[in-house]
UniProtKB/Swiss-Prot annotation:
InterPro entries: METTL16/PsiM, METTL16/RlmF, SAM-dependent_MTases_sf
Organism this protein belongs to: Gallus gallus
A GO molecular function held by the record: RNA stem-loop binding
Keyword Protein biosynthesis: no
Lineage: Eukaryota, Metazoa, Chordata, Craniata, Vertebrata
Protein name: RNA N(6)-adenosine-methyltransferase METTL16
Amino acid sequence: MALNKSMHARNRYKDKPPDFAYLAGKYPEFRQHVQTTLAGRVSLNFKDPEAVRALTCTLLKEDFGLTIDIPLERLIPTVPLRLNYIHWVEDLIGHQDADKRVLRRGIDIGTGASCIYPLLGSTLNGWYFLATEVDDMCFNYAKKNVEQNNLSDLIKVVKVPQKTLLMDALKEESEIIYDFCMCNPPFFANQLEAKGVNSRNPRRPPPSSVNTGGITEIMAEGGELEFVKRIIHDSLQLKKRLRWYSCMLGKKCSLAPLKEELKIQGVPKVTHTEFCQGRTMRWALAWSFYDDVQVPSPPSKRRKLEKPRKPITFTVLASTVKELSIKAAAMGWDAVEGIAVVRAWIEKILADLKVQHKRVPCGKDEVSLFVTAIENSWVHLRRKKRERVRQLRELPRASDDVLQAMEEEKNSQNSVSNSVDCEKSKTEDSETELVAPDEDVHLTADDELREESATKELSEHMEEEETEAKQTEASFNEGSSSAEQGAQPSEEAGNLTAEKGQSPKETSRCFLFKCLMNVKKEGNDVLVEMHWVEGQNRDLMNQLCTYLRNQVLRLVAS
């Protein structure tokens, strides 16, 4: 039940939802409506009116000792949601801090067949209720429910004419000051709204429970907005006859115009709240003409946060840490062991990349760096290296046909020089013979030298990549999988960005991304975590993580 954690703090169902299995074992009437899955989970069909009624009656009996009857043709209340409203009224009138011996008086406008608010308020707090009802069936059931629970001395159910709210109901009791009024107004203005045809977002899923309310319970002229405005109009005449006026709303969009109406009318004290239960949310509005009442603070605005993501991690094994410590000591560093030496090497790599970083406060046995990447310098280095190897591969090389033609020409020149008897010709031929082979050898040697150089650097590059892969497999545990998975696509994304020539200044932000890096002990090893903060692309952080990991391994391998 997604919204249960947002229930009223005193709601008994907030941290302990109803145990259907226990209730089914104790109450036969409820047992016939539950289903048990193959996994042993007990569930209830909230689309079945009889099942919903059985749950409400069972909860009232089990948790409050109340026995009620509700017709299937009328609204079946959910107990946790109604309990939220009762607890909020307690907050409004200061019930928790007041003398419990002082009788509190309330009015329930349209109490319904269950008469649930008066029954709960009287049972929990000993409040006196005047409960009004316009529907004959609801009135009869409400009276019966009050009588069978022996609460007639605290709850008075009265039948009133249609459209009667507060003014007519209080005509006979002009001297009594009530502490509060409660109301669940009809939410809808017509049948289309009641069926959700023209009021629900098309992307919103359908209601998860059945609606059994009668016409007067769920529909009124103008819907809940106009209904509550009529209560506001009555309150402007009654004013201090009630300390608090309140209503529950089914639509959030009704809240703002009603608050604006109260502001226009000059009502001095106004507050609101939210009621949460399961996947259902309701809103409540309260106002008062008393200056001495304590106004509960409205709920704070909850920011919609991104779903928390796991950090990108890699582990530096104890053996690797030891090698890093030896190298750090040889360089005369102060940090030569544990997380300090890993942090020091990472700081050096970041500095070489010109990635901004600073140390920030952190927990015990760990160090933290706040990292801000301005440009994608790590991909630039990899690209330059790949480009150099590619150029060496593509150096010009003479073809076999050219080499053969040059060899034939040399042989023909040798044969011509041998046929000349003149000493001068011999000398010239010999010089020619010496020059031609020298030129030929020089060209061949140059080609071979370039080939050898290209082959050697390419071989070194391939060996380096192979060593890097082996070291990665040997030194990093499964925690680095998230970084490895992001490396390939992230590199492509980085290349694409660079090819387009987009500098940070050309974007709306002056940085690529920000992250928090934690370096901490994990047994004998050291764990490096990178937590995303904000930026253009999370893949960029994957790239940097992969680069840092590989550079740390390269330090040990070199």
